């Protein structure tokens, strides 16, 4: 279906963006551009990456946005893990984490998503299951369990907890690998000024707001903290699609704070936030760039 969508988007696509949707969909692109669907999803491109033979393996849970819109983020993660002597496995059976279904009250659908992902992610003997999307990380680590508990599906809880014990967010894992001496940063780097946006799930549920900042600082970036760095960008998954009239002013406040920081690059750990903020800045013809932390670190880390 997404391959068909890639072809169908062509009349609306300009570069990496869809800037205008027609008719009843126009509200979605009135205040921000949307990312174009990638020509090839990560689940395909990752097969073309020549990974070194490694004793240790991790499973990468991509999530929908990285898989189908931003495969370059996943490719950057593979590059970093390989430098640490870790092979990245992409379990083919992974699907949506179920967060949109759960937040819409469709718990039965969310439970099916959870079971599908548990089966896929526990099929390989891996040290960690890593995600570069905080919303997905929260789903895998916490919400699969709470969904099964809410539905009384107690038989599914042991494997959900087994998965939760392996789940870790990208920045926390990289920080751990650096602290263990398995990765190191290039010396003497002065990479300029950036600003950092805290995704809601990363800071408030995973409590991992300092790890990315520490990594970016170690890499050689000067972080110009924006005002209200931890205020929501207005994305909120399907929230921004269903309630654009509320999402738009929240995004505008974030964009003002980014511009006022004086940085020409805004970095964040959430592909959903990248989609929202990059799309908003593009709509305003801003020269400020937006990237995921994984992309900023991929070329600055070396094997120890």
Region roles according to the model:
Residues 1-304:
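Iron-sulfur cluster-binding electron-transfer modules in prokaryotic oxidoreductases
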């Amino acid at each position: 279906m997404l391959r068909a969508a890639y072809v169908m988007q062509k009349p609306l696509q300009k570069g990496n963006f869809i800037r205008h949707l027609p008719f009843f969909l126009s509200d979605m692109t009135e205040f921000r551009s949307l990312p174009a669907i990638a020509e090839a999803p990560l689940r395909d491109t990752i097969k073309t990456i020549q990974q070194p033979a490694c004793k240790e393996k991790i499973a990468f849970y991509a999530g929908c946005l990285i898989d189908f819109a931003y495969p370059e983020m996943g490719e950057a993660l593979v590059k970093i893990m390989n430098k640490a002597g870790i092979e990245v496995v992409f379990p083919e059976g992974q699907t949506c984490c179920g967060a949109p279904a759960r937040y819409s009250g469709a718990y039965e659908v969310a439970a099916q998503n959870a079971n599908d992902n548990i089966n896929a992610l526990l099929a390989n003997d891996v040290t960690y299951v890593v995600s570069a999307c905080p919303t997905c990380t929260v789903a895998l680590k916490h919400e699969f369990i709470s969904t099964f508990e809410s539905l009384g599906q107690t038989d599914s809880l042991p494997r959900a907890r087994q998965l939760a014990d392996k789940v870790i967010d990208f920045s926390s894992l990289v920080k751990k690998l650096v602290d263990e001496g398995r990765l190191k940063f290039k010396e003497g780097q002065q990479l300029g000024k950036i600003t950092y946006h805290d995704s809601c799930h990363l800071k408030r549920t995973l409590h991992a707001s300092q790890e990315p900042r520490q990594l970016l600082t170690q890499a050689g970036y000067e972080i110009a903290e924006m005002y209200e760095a931890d205020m929501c960008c207005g994305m909120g998954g399907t929230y921004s699609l269903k309630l654009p009239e509320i999402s738009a002013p929240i995004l505008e406040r974030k964009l003002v704070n980014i511009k006022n920081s004086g940085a020409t690059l805004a970095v964040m750990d959430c592909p959903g936030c990248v989609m929202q903020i990059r799309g908003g800045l593009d709509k305003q013809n801003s020269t400020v760039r937006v990237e995921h932390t994984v992309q900023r670190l991929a070329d600055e880390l070396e094997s120890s």
